[in-house]
UniProtKB/Swiss-Prot annotation:
The keyword Isomerase does not apply. PANTHER family: BARBU-RELATED (PTHR12254:SF0), ENHANCER OF SPLIT MALPHA PROTEIN (PTHR12254). This is Enhancer of split malpha protein. GO terms for molecular function: ubiquitin protein ligase binding. InterPro entries: Malpha/m4/m2.
Amino acid sequence: MCQQVVVVANTNNKMKTSYSIKQVLKTLFKKQQKQQQKPQGSLESLESVDNLRNAQVEEAYYAEIDENAANEKLAQLAHSQEFEIVEEQEDEEDVYVPVRFARTTAGTFFWTTNLQPVASVEPAMCYSMQFQDRWAQA
């Protein structure tokens, strides 16, 4: 009889170990199922965060486009004003400078002078003896 009790005790131990393995496996599976369910919820939250970020980026792009459009209009306005100023300055700065040339056996020589027309020539005593002609050989 003693042997049977020992065997029964051994079977109880075997049952206990299998029972404990089952319990451990059940808890593992439950934890795994809970962890799988949590990412689904977090995926939804990640998706909403991603949508929010996309909306913010889109708003930033639209704001930048509006700002660039305004800046382009300002740049065009400034450019047109600069162009008008440059045209006015060119009109004011256009000075006719006669170019004179002479062909010789040594080559063709070109020169300019800053002498005024004959009507506005001052008396000869006001002129200095420094030559102000510019010349170059072609």
